[in-house]
Amino acid sequence: MSYYRWLGLYTRRVAKRGYTRDTIRGGASEWDVSRPFSSYVRTLGVLAVHPVRFFELLPKIPDPRAPALFLIFSGLLAAILWLLFGGLFPALVALVLPLPLSSLLAGLYHVGVLGGRYGYVVTWRVLAYPLGFYLPFAAVPVLGPLGAIFVGLVLMPIGLARVQEIGPLRAVLVGLVVAGLVGATCFFLFFA
């Protein structure tokens, strides 16, 4: 009897919906919970070097477990870096903010991809990995803005085009609009 059947995760009903043992555990491109550190480094490397391949292999299922845990793990690392570079309050914000922020940002991106092939949760899955990639870099003074540009204008359009199966021009326009909204919000909150 397999481990998944023993836990009751891989049943006939789950198999009928198209889930496999890999999609329950985390697909080929996803962060693997059983090996958090090595899988985290591998996920960051693939996102940085082969983003098209990462998003092509990303399972298009409405299962938030692996991306949510990836964001939480990224938030922990970001909190450690914020504690070193910014103090206690930014570190606490880095612990609490990733999941609610990802839900809000995914809503903005999903409005732009309405008519795409999949629903909101799949759009959120596309956002979760680049956001988790960005969180630790946000604490480092020079890398923060560069990471935001890379995530918002490179990774997100690639992910939206590949996963939601919308055109690349539309994906870039959605990325530009959301980046403009986020940039304007940050400017008015922190500088104006």
What are these model-derived regions, one by one?
Residues 15-23, 95, 123-127:
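Short, functional N-terminal and low-complexity linear motifs
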Residues 62, 69-70, 141-142, 178, ...:
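Residue-level signal for alpha-helical context at structural boundaries
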Residues 21-118:
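Selected alpha-helical membrane-embedding segments in polytopic membrane proteins
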Residues 12-14, 62, 132:
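Amphipathic alpha-helical interaction segments
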Residues 105-187:
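Hydrophobic alpha-helical transmembrane segments and adjacent short intramembrane/lumenal linkers
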Residues 78-101, 138-152, 182-192:
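Membrane-helix interface segments in multi-pass membrane proteins
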Residues 1-16:
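Soluble N-terminal domains of membrane-associated systems
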